[in-house]
Amino acid sequence: MAGNTIGQLFRVTTFGESHGLALGCIVDGVPPGIPLTEADLQHDLDRRRPGTSRYTTQRREPDQVKILSGVFEGVTTGTSIGLLIENTDQRSQDYSAIKDVFRPGHADYTYEQKYGLRDYRGGGRSSARETAMRVAAGAIAKKYLAEKFGIEIRGCLTQMGDIPLDIKDWSQVEQNPFFCPDPDKIDALDELMRALKKEGDSIGAKVTVVASGVPAGLGEPVFDRLDADIAHALMSINAVKGVEIGDGFDVVALRGSQNRDEITKDGFQSNHAGGILGGISSGQQIIAHMALKPTSSITVPGRTINRFGEEVEMITKGRHDPCVGIRAVPIAEAMLAIVLMDHLLRQRAQNADVKTDIPRW
C-alpha cells in the first residue's frame, strides 16, 4: 500500500489501523536542537481525542503519545523521530455483522475492489483514527514554525449544516466543544446535535484554518505550488470533499476589479487570494477552508449489498461522530503545519541567500 507519506524535506509517514494494536509515524527532516517532549505533542492530541464530549464518538482512547526515537535529553537529534500511540478501547465485535456487507458511503467497497480484502473493524486503515498520528507530527511542525519563525496556525468550525459561523472571537474557539468562534451560535449547534442524536443521523461541516506570520516566497511552481500542496494535504483528511483557498468558489461571481488584491505602500488592501499568488506565499495570512461530508455511520436504515451481490438493509453500529467536522479542526491545523514546514525547509535549502529590496509587510 503506497501513499502513506507526505512531504519532501519534512516527511511524515503514518502506519496503523483503527482496531490494530497501535498507530505510529516516522517524522524525517526535523532540524537538530529543537526542544521537544511528549507534552508538546499531547495538547493537540487531546483536542482531537475521541470521547471528550457528548458531541463526539464515545470511543475512549487516551491517545498518549510515546516518542521512540530522534529525541535525546529533551532536544531533537536530527534523526528520524518515531512516534507511537497504543489503541486501548477497541470494540471489534461491534463490526462483526458487517464482515460481508459494504457500508454505503464508506471505503468498504472500494478497498475490497482495490486489495481483494479489507479490515472491516472500524474501517481499518481508512478510519479517521489514523489522523491521530498526523496531529502528533503536525504538533512538531507547529512548534518549530512558532518558535523559529513566529508562524501561528489556528483553526475553527465555520459552518455546521445550514448554520454559518462567523469568526468573531478566536479566544472562544477553545472554550466550547465545537471549536466555534461565534459564541452567539453555540446554543443553535447544541440544539442541532441533540436533534441528530435523537434521529440517529449526521451532518456536514466547514472548517477554516489560518496561518499568520508566513513569510513571502514559500511554494515551488509549478506542480508543487503552495496552494496545490495545501489542497492535497487537506483533501487527504477523511470525509473532506472540497477545499478552498482564500475566497475559493466565491470568486466565480466576482469581477477582476473586485478580486485582485491591490497593493499600496502600506501593503495589500485585501486578501481574496488567501495569501498565495502564483503558487507562492505573499506574506499575508494563508486562509484555507475545507468541506466535510456527513458521516455515513448512522443508525438510519439504508440500502446496500453484501459481497455476494445480494441487497440488504444496513444500520451502522458502533461509536461514531454525528459531525466529523468538529474533531477535524486540529487535524486541519496539523496538515497545514506539515505543508508549511516542508516548504519552509525547501525555501531555505534553495534560496537562503536571496535578498530583495521589495517591501514586505
Swiss-Prot record:
Reaction catalyzed: 5-O-(1-carboxyvinyl)-3-phosphoshikimate = chorismate + phosphate
- What UniProt keywords are attached to this protein's entry? Amino-acid biosynthesis, Aromatic amino acid biosynthesis, FAD, Flavoprotein, FMN, Lyase, NADP
Q: Where does NADP(+) bind?
A: 48, 54
Q: Which GO terms describe its cellular component?
A: cytosol
Which biological processes are named by the entry's GO terms?
amino acid biosynthetic process; aromatic amino acid family biosynthetic process; chorismate biosynthetic process
EC no.?
A: 4.2.3.5
Listed pathway(s): Metabolic intermediate biosynthesis; chorismate biosynthesis; chorismate from D-erythrose 4-phosphate and phosphoenolpyruvate: step 7/7
What the entry lists under PROSITE patterns is as follows: CHORISMATE_SYNTHASE_1 (PS00787), CHORISMATE_SYNTHASE_2 (PS00788), CHORISMATE_SYNTHASE_3 (PS00789)
Cofactor binding mode, per the note?
Reduced FMN (FMNH(2)). It can also use FAD, however FMN is the preferred cofactor.
Activity regulation summary: Competitively inhibited by 6R-6-fluoro-EPSP.
The annotated subunit structure for this chain is: Homotetramer.
Role of this protein: This reaction introduces a second double bond into the aromatic ring system. It uses NADPH to reduce FMN.
Q: Matching NCBIfam families, A to Z? A: aroC, PRK05382.1
Q: What is this protein called?
A: Chorismate synthase
Organism whose genome encodes this protein: Escherichia coli (strain K12)
Tell me what gene encodes this.
aroC
